[in-house]
Structure formats: C-alpha cells, structure tokens
Amino acid sequence: MKSWQKVIVGGASLTLASTLLVGCGSASKDKMDSASSSDSKTIKLWVPTGAKKSYADIVAKFEKDSGYTVKVVESEDPKAQEKIKKDASTAADVFSLPHDQLGQLVESGTIQEVPEEYTKEIAATATDQAIVGAQYKGKTYSFPFGIESQVLFYNKSKLAAEDVASYDTITTKATFGGTFKQANAYATGPLFMSVGNTLFGENGEDVKGTNWGNEKGVAVLKWIADQASNKGFVNLDANNVISKFGDGSVASFESGPWDYEAAQKAIGKENLGIAAYPKVTIGGETVQQKAFLGVKLYAVNQAPAKGDTKRIAASYKLASYLTNAESQENQFKTRNIVPANKEVQSSEAVQSNELAKTVITMGSSSEYTVVMPKLSQMGTFWTESAAILSDTFNGKTKEGDYLAKLQQFDKDIAATK
C-alpha cells in the first residue's frame, strides 16, 4: 500500500503542518514536500444524486473560509464503496454514503478515524443512534447528517391514533398489509431483535454474534406463520402496496419516507396518518416492534491528497461544514432529509412535520430501531433470512423444523467471509 494511503491526520486545522505517516518505508521528506506543493487546492466532493444545488451555499461558504475550491459531483450513494475502493486515488476527497458501507471501507484501509476535534463535535451534536452509525468498533470514521427509518402509514378513516399503537388492534379493527409471501428481510428481519435476539451481536459488529436459533426465534417464525390465517393481515408484493392502500384493501402498512407522497396521493392528505411502529405480541409476550435504522454520512478519503496534510485537513473541515446544523436545516428544507443533529431535530420546522417527527421517534432510541450492521456478511443475511421468512409464511418449512433452520442460519452467517 502506498504511503499516502496510510496518512493519519493528527489535527484538523487548516494550518496543519505535519502528519503521522504509517508504513512510509523509504519515502523521503523531499518527495513529500514536492507532492504537497504540486497538488492543486481543489477538493472533489461527491454528493447524493439530485443534491448538488442544495449544497451550493454551504460549499460557497467553505470555499470563502478555506481558500479551497470544491468540485461538486453528484454520485449514487449505494455505489460509494464500490467506486472508492476501485481507485481511491482518483475518487472524491469527501463523499456521501449509507452507514452500512462504513465497516468495509474501514477494514480495507480506505478511510481513517476522524480527528479528535470533530469526534468531540459529533458526540456533542448528533443523536446516540446516529453516532453509532458513524462509528466502527467504537471509533468515529464519518460525519452523520441524516437518519432514515420506516414508519407506520395508516388510513385515519379506518383506524384511530390509539388503535395503531397495537398490531393486534390494527388487525382486529381493520387490516395491515405486509410482504411475507416474498419476504423483505429489511422490513421483517428486525422482528427477531424485537424479542431480544441479536444480529451480529449487540453492536452489530460481531460476525459470530447472531443468535436467532432459540425459543424466541422460533416464536417469531410461529408468529409469521400465523399471519397467513390472520383475517386482518393482507399479503402484498412490492408493486401493489400503494394501490391496495388506495383502494381500501389495507388500512395500514409499514414503509419509509420514500412512500409518503404516494401514500398521501392514494388516500388524500386529510386521511393519511403516520405513527411509530406498534407493539406486537410474539410468543405470549408483548414487545415493541423494531425497524432497521439507516444513517446518512459524509466521510473523507485521504488518498487523492497524496500526503498533502493541508488538503486532508481541509477535507475534514468540508465534511464538518456539510453536516453542521445550518447544512442539516437546509437539507431538511430542500430535500426532506431528517436531521441527525439533536438541535435541528428539536426545531419548530422539524417538529411540526408529522413524518419527520415520527422518523425521529423511531430513530432516536434503541427501543424502536436497530442500527443496521456494517459488516460485509449482511449480503448473506439478506438472502438467507428472506428465504427462511418466506418459506415459513408459505408453509414450506414446518413448525418442527423452525429451530434447526434458525440454528443453521446462525452458523451460516458466522461462517461467511
């Protein structure tokens, strides 16, 4: 690995004059000075698709304060890891990404720990769940700027606010729509954490820490199987959720902010209710149903700077600007990104927005959400858990085989490289 890929910034000010280089080998000071002086004062920034215009003011402010020029490029967040790891030296200095990619980027040495100045800043301003999303193995590697969680959408002409606090009440008085026949593990998998089981351990970072193969896990599968005969449950597929909500076939369903406008259009603004997830009774115990929490991040890639400590420090400064309170307020206003900043979350503008307020309720406590693990083994999780969930609902897997299936699942996940 080249020396500039192992730069660790010891400070964050733009006047940073030195840095610790790990594994430099025979690289000389003259070579480093030459590289530093020849680099342009341009920082490449990758922002989410459709977000370039919304960052114009904060980027202009940074350019004025720092003396650096920022080249802003829109890039698809889900492909951030793939693009960065392909050639880090030609990628962006600062880039946006979903938090579940963080672990692999850290393990590959692509990104380094955030300087202490910013770590303290993040700890003081971000919610606890957002901080967890920005960390890996207890260290902070990125800057959180938004949170995302599913919520419950319901038809207020069919269900009252007090009704939707309980899944049993929802399905007794009206109907709930879910995709169980072709299970979506993103939506249904967290039921196992709702009963106290773990996915990759308590912090989501232990490959051998999944423990679904127990009595509680079996109870979850029994509950899923029971929904096939629950008159208040309507099985849906990914393509008909909104249409079934619109024609009255289902009175409620769980989804994310991405379905808000469609849900509103389907039944009318005056009829659309939004609530946190309900409580659900599984194995005779009433528990709070949980969802996965996603955290939107900005991270710094030191490779393009090739050891230029001032440019690296400026990149961290830019990431701080992009995720400060002012920027998060603007992202909420222009793009409906629910902020990770505690102060912005409590603002009148955010609290008066029913959807944002509900996402914050879901995303501000481990009672309602589990921060999605950041391990590469999640690829195996999505495939295998979806198969188990679908086979259970469809009756392909019999009750007597539930425990063995889950125990094998735990082993398969632990053995994945």
Predicted regions, residues:
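Conserved N-terminal structural module of periplasmic/extracytoplasmic solute-binding proteins
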Residues: S3-S13, A17-Q101, T286, Q408-K417
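Short amphipathic alpha-helical coupling segments at ligand-binding clamshell hinges
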Residues: S54-I58, Y68, K216-W223, K306-L322, ...
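Short helix-initiation/N-cap motifs at beta->coil->alpha
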Residues: E74-K83, D100, V234-D247, W258
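Alpha-to-beta junction loops
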Residues: D87-L97, A174-F176, D247-S255, E270
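Hinge/lid segment of periplasmic solute-binding proteins
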Residues: H99-V151, E162, I274-A275
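C-terminal capping/gating helix-and-loop segments adjacent to ligand/active sites or protein-protein/ligand interfaces
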Residues: Q135, V338, K357-D412
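Extracytoplasmic/periplasmic substrate-recognition and gating elements
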Residues: G138, A266-T334
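Glycine-centered hinge/linker elements that transmit conformational signals in sensory
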Residues: D206-N235
